[in-house]
């Protein structure tokens, strides 16, 4: 049975939470789709919403997650912690 994705989203369009090591993207239900850095390293490309049944396909370059890049966030992602600091200022 084919998988039905709500959408396909570029990794660069997702927010990154450095503390939790998780990428997020807004879900229409009000929660957020989530995928971890480890899932991406394992070539997993499905981000799930914990509050509903929707899933998205994350478009990314697996080479960015090869061994040796564990301490670096992919370039061009939005750092959620930085957004919170900027919003509070």
Swiss-Prot record:
Pathway assigned to this chain's UniProt record: Protein modification; peptidyl-diphthamide biosynthesis
Residue ranges annotated for the DPH-type MB domain, each copy included: 5-61
Coiled-coil region(s): none
Keyword match Cytoplasm: yes
Domain notes: The DPH-type metal-binding (MB) domain can also bind zinc. However, iron is the physiological binding partner as zinc binding impairs the protein electron donor function.
Reported function: Required for the first step of diphthamide biosynthesis, a post-translational modification of histidine which occurs in elongation factor 2. DPH1 and DPH2 transfer a 3-amino-3-carboxypropyl (ACP) group from S-adenosyl-L-methionine (SAM) to a histidine residue, the reaction is assisted by a reduction system comprising KTI11/DPH3 and a NADH-dependent reductase, predominantly CBR1. Acts as an electron donor to reduce the Fe-S cluster in DPH1-DPH2 keeping the [4Fe-4S] clusters in the active and reduced state.
Protein name per UniProt: Diphthamide biosynthesis protein 3
Species, as recorded: Mycosarcoma maydis (Corn smut fungus)
Source species taxonomy: Eukaryota, Fungi, Dikarya, Basidiomycota, Ustilaginomycotina
């Amino acid at each position: 049975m084919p998988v039905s994705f709500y959408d396909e989203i570029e990794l660069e369009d997702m927010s990154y939470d450095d503390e939790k090591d998780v990428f997020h993207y807004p879900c229409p239900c009000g929660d957020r789709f989530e995928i971890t850095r480890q899932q991406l390293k394992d070539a997993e490309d499905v981000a799930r919403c914990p509050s509903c049944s929707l899933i998205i396909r994350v478009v990314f370059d697996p080479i960015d997650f090869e061994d040796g890049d564990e301490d670096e966030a992919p370039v061009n992602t939005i750092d959620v912690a930085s957004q919170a600091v900027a919003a509070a200022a």
